[in-house]
From Swiss-Prot:
Result for mutant: residue 1127 to F: Delayed epithelial tight junction assembly
Biased composition (Polar residues): 154-163, 171-187, 204-224, 968-982, 1136-1149, 1221-1245, 1337-1346
Bias kind Basic and acidic residues: ranges: 190-203, 246-260, 983-1009, 1150-1177, 1285-1298, 1347-1356
Keywords: Acetylation, Cell cycle, Cell division, Cell junction, Cell membrane, Coiled coil, Cytoplasm, Cytoskeleton, Differentiation, Disease variant, Lipid-binding, Membrane, Phosphoprotein, Repeat, Tight junction
PANTHER family xref list: PARTITIONING DEFECTIVE 3 HOMOLOG, PARTITIONING DEFECTIVE 3 RELATED
Listed GO MF terms: phosphatidylinositol binding; phosphatidylinositol-3,4,5-trisphosphate binding; phosphatidylinositol-3-phosphate binding; phosphatidylinositol-4,5-bisphosphate binding
Misc remark: Antibodies against PARD3 are present in sera from patients with cutaneous T-cell lymphomas.
Domain notes: Contains a conserved N-terminal oligomerization domain (NTD) that is involved in oligomerization and is essential for proper subapical membrane localization.
The protein's name: Partitioning defective 3 homolog
Length: 1356
């Protein structure tokens, strides 16, 4: 345990262990600590006579401490000391051995002896409460510190009287010894509480200090609320020069100055006159302004002028400069001007109006009287009854407003000010029979022990319904009891439960009652039991006490003249007319925060910019969170412009500065006060405007929703210089600027926003939007983020069509205003699957499996036509307009496509509108897309996007994926491979060196190529245009959009089938040409296989073996295997080198290509790794009659259909081979060892078709590397398909002929077989006729010998 021993004002905490120690030991330890506290050495003499308990009991020196004292008790030491230090309160003892000079030492004479003489029994005085009430010649000082130099007894007994320190009596009131001013004038005033007394205090005379060491109504030591100090307040005297003012320092600092209270006492009874006005429904004919004192306090309404011929002038009801301080039972003092107007309008609904008026002659006296009440006003303005009516406005006195007529139905609040006005009206409306007493200053010296709070607060009655998650809050208590009882406080609000759902209970609230049971004296465990006793689904009633902070708002660009009484020379527009004449109103809301952290204020804001000059128009409310403080308050609306927040103006600032001001003010002031004060500008419709000043609302005018008493309206004349706040009601431009209808001028509310500004669009209510648009519709700022229904181009074109009265905003459409399945309202699971009603629409979801791309699309505004707007068609985001919304990922963009398609906005057939390309696309992907969309023909544009029957989930993947290993879907795998390779090859410029006929052919091929665009491109193709010629399509865009809507789904299916048949017919024709070439190539391949290095060339074509080496030489098997291993390391076939040919060759042929095909096939048969075989094929096509096969393999054609066509083509193979063989030129063989491939290309230019294929990078993937190695990117899907078909054909021939006849063993066949098995084997030389073409039977026998019996089928 530990106790606190008080030596005068110095408190020493002494640890006592378990308390089993004597009081004598405690005194010794306390003295030692006291010496250290006052910085004295151990020889400093201190004598402690006794220790007294707080309740007055004296502790015996032999008592055990734990028996006579409790833990944390405070004990008072009655002591003497050698040389009292001059340290004041004893808490600062840094000046060791030094003393401050005595200012008044000379005036005190030579009596420098200490007031604390050695202890004498006769000098001991027992001070008790009864003794304090007696007339003892004791003088009370500010402190009982022994540092005060004692005064002689003659001084105490002499005729000195004390006065309260004030500006009239600047008595020094501190711990330093001072002098007393002799009382020569005035007599002390007394109150009925205590008598006129003088006291003298010694350190031993402290038995009456028991209260100061307890947490009760006088917990602070001898503070201003202490009863002994209260004597100073009760002995107030008026000095002879009481009217003079002195601005010197008044002590004690912070004490209420009483010097101003002794001016001549003007009572409100002498000033106020009562004016009774019968209400006949007509206007009063007065113009009023707020009447403010010099300190800014509102003292009422000042009658500025009277209308000529009005009721007030005719009946002589008021005079100019009269001050109205009360209307009926509503006090107008210390009220905001908006509240005063509200009370004025309420009074205009009563049959008789009682005005309490201070005449103009007494106005100065009334203002002086208000100054004497100022301090008391600030101490009581935050009473529980006036928490929302106090002076919290942005400008308490100077807001000059043209106001609207009454809107409220409910009667005004019954609120008492700090001083009651006379003539307090009775419910009947008549004045009382006797006036109330004049205001007096009452100084309370005690505070209720039940509250004991630093700030004055309010009581709240809260009912919570206990559910399955409990009440949802926790409680705590103080560790030190107050007067024997521990207060119970709400510790925190749990994230689930009744408290957070209700939203009114706050952390820090003090519980007063639970279900009517007073909690005073109850422990925390008892309160918990009481709360837990509430049954399930039962209601618990809580009475809580909440402390309130004073809120002094900042000025809102208010001029000093506005804070004072308006002068007669002011302009007429500064007068306040109580009738509206504008088109918008300014409202003030004080929104209480939840303080539970559920949603903060709960609003999302946006910044608007002007379309003409890009000027910032202000901050507007974008949306309101359902469940937030603003939603529960219910008064803030979407598109309200924020004028000021917590007294800080947002006008005249850029949107960025205003947003920063908004964040800072809401995060500091809002959290500090628990309430956010908002001033907003809201448009009013003309039908709600009233006519006459001060007149009650007529029956023909509907009464709108009642405003809360915390609501106010302020002047638009104060903000007349702001852009968009024009007073002309005929200008729709001002309305559009102030309301911001387009909904797209948004700064991102989710970037660096505090928790109070978290953006969660969860409001189920329809936004209240103006019915008219303007021709000044603004464009979106670049910070626009999110999926917004409104479109900037829509507003712009609608304004062109009808600038005065345009069609309704898309936001007004209730169908578009709220969509449960709309974008931004779906969870992650709903975005993927839930919103699609049938399986066919899931194709858009499957596109999310494609690789992500950064598709940044720049803004484009003109998307819809004027005709569409006039026709009343809803403005929706279709086609490229979806891309205008900046999307954080491809997935969110595809979700937008899926949603619009689900709603029927994207028909199956759509011309491709052009959009300028943004940043970040992959170059190869962009090039492929650009080629697909590059200048489509107008006639054939309808054939842009096709869907084939083979579309599956796999077909929607990106074309850059590797070849599939699924053996049951070779055609699909090849198809994806071809899509990827041919899209990569689309970078070339096909316009180079082409005739008009070739260009037309290329366009036809590009159209065919579009038919194979699948998967992701199928969805994105309806949205984006990645091409370059953006402006070319603007003329055709309107017609195309109309055409696309005229097609039905049935016509689309028919057209798709016809197009597919046409594509298949073209593919069949092309493959027939390929088959003829292959048959001839096989015959030549037979010749090349049996040829040798030393044989003569025929037709200028050297053998394949001769192209690989300078002179054929036998190679050992070891060398052959080493070479094979070397090629295998780079995953390249050994025999894939291109054959350098003679420099005298006149025309290249396709023999070499067929030969390499054959050798690579044999090499693949010997390879055991299936995966390696799939990646080791790349072929050249240097034959002159090669056609750019851009169509082959682009669509899924089954192998069975291809084999059927192949069998038909075999019958013509012999004739075709014979014709081509006979047409070859004859030329003698030359050594080709020294001729490189580059020299061959330079000396002999190939034919035109081959030259174009060679120069075009589109076909670069068809050709291998010039050094004979395969390029890693050189896979060609078309050649792979040809190889697959060839191998399948040969496999079938082998199986058929093996059944008919056994294989023959010829030396040439054997040599060929050995050559395939061992590449180093050189066949024996022998005569062979090269001028006779081989028969097809030889090719068949060659296939049987060269193909192993257990060869594996080749799959790509």
């Amino acid at each position: 345990m530990k106790v606190t021993v008080c030596f005068g004002r110095t408190r020493v905490v002494v640890p006592c262990g378990d308390g089993h120690m004597k009081v004598f030991s405690l005194i010794q330890q306390a003295v030692t600590r006291y010496r250290k506290a006052i910085a004295k050495d151990p020889n400093y003499w201190i004598q402690v006579h006794r220790l007294e308990h707080g309740d007055g009991g004296i502790l015996d020196l032999d008592d055990i401490l734990c028996d006579v004292a409790d833990d944390k008790d405070r004990l008072v030491a009655v002591f003497d000391e050698q040389d009292p230090h001059h340290g004041g309160d004893g808490t600062s003892a840094s000046s060791t051995g030094t003393q401050s000079p005595e200012i008044f030492g000379s005036e005190l004479g030579t009596n420098n002896v200490s007031a604390f003489q050695p202890y004498q029994a006769t000098s001991e005085i027992e001070v008790t409460p009864s003794v304090l009430r007696a007339n003892m010649p004791l003088h009370v000082r500010r402190s009982s510190d022994p540092a005060l130099i004692g005064l002689s007894t003659s001084v105490s007994d002499s005729n000195f009287s004390s006065e309260e320190p004030s500006r009239k009596n600047p008595t020094r009131w501190s711990t330093t010894a001072g002098f007393l001013k002799q009382n020569t004038a005035g007599s002390p005033k007394t109150c009925d509480r205590k008598k006129d007394e003088n006291y003298r205090s010694l350190p031993r005379d402290t038995s009456n200090w028991s209260n100061q060491f307890q947490r009760d109504n006088a917990r602070s030591s001898l503070s201003a609320s202490h009863p002994m100090v209260g004597k100073w307040l009760e002995k107030q005297e008026q000095d002879e020069d009481g009217t003079e003012e002195d601005n010197s320092r008044v002590e004690p600092v912070g004490h209420a100055d009483t010097g101003l209270e002794h001016i001549p006492n003007f009572s409100l009874d002498d000033m106020v006159k009562l004016v009774e006005v019968p209400n006949d429904g007509g206007p009063l004919g007065i113009h009023v302004v707020p009447f403010s004192a010099r300190g800014g306090r509102t003292l009422g309404l000042l009658v500025k002028r009277l209308e000529k011929g009005g009721k007030a002038e005719h009946e002589n009801l008021f005079r100019e400069n009269d001050c109205i301080v009360r209307i009926n039972d509503g006090d107008l003092r210390n009220r905001r001007f908006e509240q005063a107007q509200h009370m004025f309008r309420q009074a205009m609904r009563t049959p008789i109006i009682w005005f309490h008026v201070v005449p103009a002659a007494n106005k100065e006296q009334y203002e002086q009287l208000s100054q004497s009440e100022k301090n008391n006003y600030y101490s009581s303005r935050f009473s529980p009854d006036s928490q929302y009516i106090d002076n919290r406005s942005v400008n308490s006195a100077g807001l000059h407003t043209v106001q609207r007529a009454p809107r409220l139905n409910h009667p005004p609040e019954q609120i008492d000010s700090h001083s009651r006005l006379p003539h307090s009206a009775h419910p009947s409306g008549k004045p009382p029979s006797a006036p109330a007493s004049a205001p007096q200053n009452v100084f309370s010296t005690t505070v209720s022990s039940g509250y004991n709070t630093k700030k004055i607060g309010k009581r709240l009655n809260i009912q919570l319904k206990k559910g399955t998650e409990g009440l949802g809050f926790s409680i705590t208590s103080r560790d030190v009891t107050i007067g024997g009882s521990a207060p119970i406080y709400v510790k925190n609000i749990l994230p689930r439960g009744a408290a957070i759902q209700d939203g009114r209970l706050k952390a820090g609230d003090r519980l007063i009652e639970v279900n009517g049971v007073d909690l005073v004296g109850k422990s925390q465990e008892e309160v918990v039991s009481l709360l837990r006793s509430t049954k399930m689904e039962g209601t618990v009633s809580l009475l809580v006490f909440r402390q309130e902070d004073a809120f002094h708002p900042r000025e809102l660009n208010a001029e000093p003249s506005q804070m004072q009484i308006p002068k007669e020379t002011k302009a007429e527009d500064e007068d306040i007319v109580l009738t509206p004449d504008g088109t918008r109103e300014f409202l003030t809301f004080e929104v209480p925060l939840n303080d539970s952290g559920s949603a903060g204020l709960g609003v999302s804001v946006k910044g608007n910019r002007s379309k003409e000059n890009h000027a910032d128009l202000g901050i507007f409310v974008k949306s309101i969170i359902n469940g937030g403080a603003a939603s529960k308050d219910g008064r803030l609306r979407v598109n309200d412009q924020l004028i000021a927040v917590n007294g800080e103006s947002l006008l005249g600032k850029t949107n960025q500065d205003a947003m920063e001001t908004l964040r800072r003010s809401m995060s500091t002031e809002g959290n500090k006060r628990g309430m956010i004060q908002l001033i907003v500008a809201r448009r009013i419709s003309k039908c709600n405007e009233l006519k006459s000043p001060g007149s009650p609302p007529g029956p023909e005018l509907p009464i709108e929703t009642a405003l809360d008493d915390r609501e106010r309206r302020i002047s638009h004349s104060l903000y007349s210089g702001i852009e968009g706040l024009d007073e002309s009601p005929s200008r729709n431009a001002a309305l559009s600027r102030i309301m911001g209808e387009s909904g797209k001028y948004q700064l991102s509310p989710t970037v660096n926003m505090p928790q109070d500004d978290t953006v969660i669009i969860e409001d189920d209510r329809l936004p209240v939007l103006p019915p008219h648009l303007s021709d000044q519709s603004s464009s979106s700022s670049h910070d626009d983020v999110g999926f917004v229904t409104a479109d900037a181009g829509t507003w712009a074109k609608a304004a062109i069509s009808d600038s005065a009265d345009c069609s309704l905003s898309p936001d007004v459409d209730p169908v578009l205003a709220f969509q449960r399945e709309g974008f931004g309202r779906q969870s992650m699971s709903e975005k993927r699957t839930k919103q699609f009603s049938d399986a066919s629409q899931l194709d858009f979801v499957k596109t999310r499996k494609s690789k992500s791309m950064d598709l940044g699309i720049a803004d484009e505004t003109k998307l819809n036509t004027v005709d569409d707007q006039k026709a009343g068609s809803p403005s929706r985001d279709v086609g490229p307009s979806l891309g205008l919304k900046k999307s954080s990922s491809l997935e969110s963009l595809q979700t937008a496509v899926a949603e619009v398609t689900l709603n029927g906005d994207i028909p199956f057939h759509r011309p491709r509108p052009r959009i300028i390309r943004g940043r970040g696309c992959n170059e190869s992907f962009r090039a492929a897309i650009d080629k697909s969309y590059d200048k489509p023909a107008v006639d054939d544009d309808d054939e842009g996007m096709e869907t084939l029957e083979e579309d599956t989930e796999e077909s929607s993947r990106s074309g850059r994926e590797s070849v599939s290993t699924a053996s049951d879907q070779p055609s699909h795998s090849l198809e994806r491979q071809m899509n990827g390779n041919q899209e990569k090859g689309d970078k070339t410029d096909r316009k180079k060196d082409k005739t008009g006929k070739e260009k037309k052919k290329d366009r036809d091929k590009e159209k065919d190529k579009m038919k194979a665009k699948k998967g992701m491109l199928k969805g994105l193709g309806d949205m984006f245009r990645f091409g370059k010629h953006r402006k070319d399509d603007k003329i055709e865009k309107t017609g195309k959009i109309k055409i696309q809507e005229s097609f039905t789904s049935e016509e689309e299916r028919i057209r798709m089938k016809q197009e597919q048949e046409r594509i298949q017919a073209k593919t069949r024709e092309f493959r027939e040409r390929q088959a003829r070439e292959r048959d001839y190539a096989e015959i030549q391949d037979f010749h090349r296989t049996f040829g040798c290095d030393d044989e003569l060339m025929y037709g200028g074509v050297s053998s394949y073996e001769g192209s690989m080496a300078l002179n054929a030489r036998p190679q050992s098997p070891r060398e052959g295997h080493m070479m094979d291993a070397l090629y295998a390391q780079v995953k390249k076939p050994r025999n894939s080198k291109p054959s350098p040919v003679d420099s005298n060759r006149s025309t290249p042929s396709n023999h070499d290509r067929i030969q390499r095909l054959r050798q690579e096939f044999q090499q693949a048969k010997q390879d055991e790794d299936v995966e390696d075989r799939r990646r080791t094929y790349s072929f050249e096509q240097p034959w002159p009659n090669a056609r750019p096969a851009t169509q082959s393999g682009r669509h899924s054609v089954s192998v069975e259909v291809q084999m059927q066509r192949q069998r038909q083509e075999e019958r013509e193979s012999s004739q075709q081979a014979q014709r081509q063989y006979s047409s070859l030129p004859r030329q003698s063989r030359k050594n080709a060892s020294s001729v490189s491939q580059d020299s061959w290309e330079q000396n002999y230019s190939p034919g035109e078709g081959f030259q174009s294929a060679k120069e075009n990078p589109r076909y670069s993937s068809y050709q291998g590397s010039r050094n004979g190695y395969l390029g890693g990117h050189g896979f060609n899907a078309r050649v792979m398909l040809e190889t697959q078909e060839l191998l399948r054909q040969e496999q079938r021939r082998k199986e058929q002929q093996m059944k008919k006849q056994p294989p023959s063993e010829g030396p040439s066949n054997y040599d060929s077989y050995k050559k395939v098995q061992d590449p180093s084997y050189a066949p024996p030389k022998g005569p062979f006729r090269q001028d006779v073409p081989p028969s097809p039977s030889q090719v068949a026998r060659l296939n049987r010998l060269q193909t192993p019996e257990k060869g594996r089928p080749f799959y790509s």
